[in-house]
């Protein structure tokens, strides 16, 4: 074989090797990109949707991702939409929303988001399997309403957000007026898996529930007549906290098996009735109070200005409401309901349902009255 032919063979082999390496790298890049925009299925909590069509500043990976978990039930879907809209509008951070729903709500939610100015947000829709709650909750005949499975989604944050080290959970009855990055950057003390806003803080006045006493200490949530509660040596006068908004250190949550601890107390309550009947409907707060007793950090009180839903009257000045970083309509008077306080603030962020399935009750009433 001539020297020229040898050179040609070597050149062909070199080109083939180059193409092989290039092909291998391309496959690796494709795999990496697929991993960036999808998660594998999880038994019980199934991610079914992910929208990566956000501005490049969000998806290029140079900013830390801020996971925000919100539960969205069909009958309260407008609340979740308003909350998400307020968060997205008031930040330039890399936020991804984990929206937890039950079967049947995903299509409605997806349609709502895709038909509004929220169509470019990053989000995942996660179906919550109610079988997770079997043996852990039971219907109380004295309660006027049935159990709401999605209220327990907050107990399963490490499963909902499997890759995150930190996350924010918030209820659907909130409006965020500050930059969510500030809440995400809440410092947590070593060994603490979560940071809550305590009910005794200076900005959220103590709420007196008719016939129920004060909703700001442990005795309002736990039955101190039960031996199992007394043997925990928790002071009944300890200030409670509100679990409707909190920041979680998921690494610490996993290390301490917080979810398993919460499930333990849920099961014990089913067997022994450990929760106080003083505050009707408080079925998610008691196990959290037990597990996080003197083992939680605190968030800035302005990041959970609550009790806006405790009555239809206005308890705060307009100046204070405007200064709040997060407004929380916890209580029976929801901002999408028949009567509520500060509805003008909430409606600023509400996006009408393009399908017409969800509508504001008070508007419905107003229209009926004009006929």
Swiss-Prot record:
A GO term, aspect molecular function: UDP-glycosyltransferase activity
Enzyme Commission code(s) on record: 2.4.1.-
Glycosylation: residue positions: 103, 257
Enzyme kind, highest EC tier: transferase
Gene3D superfamilies hit by this protein: Spore Coat Polysaccharide Biosynthesis Protein SpsA, Chain A
Lumenal face residues: 29-371
Membrane-crossing segments per the record: 8-28
Bilayer disposition of the protein: Single-pass type II membrane protein
Top-level taxon in the UniProt lineage: Eukaryota
Pfam families the record matches: Glyco_transf_8
Subcellular location: Membrane
Key words, A-Z: Glycoprotein, Glycosyltransferase, Membrane, Signal-anchor, Transferase, Transmembrane, Transmembrane helix
Family of this protein: Belongs to the glycosyltransferase 8 family.
UniProt-recorded name of the protein: Glycosyltransferase 8 domain-containing protein 1
Gene: GLT8D1
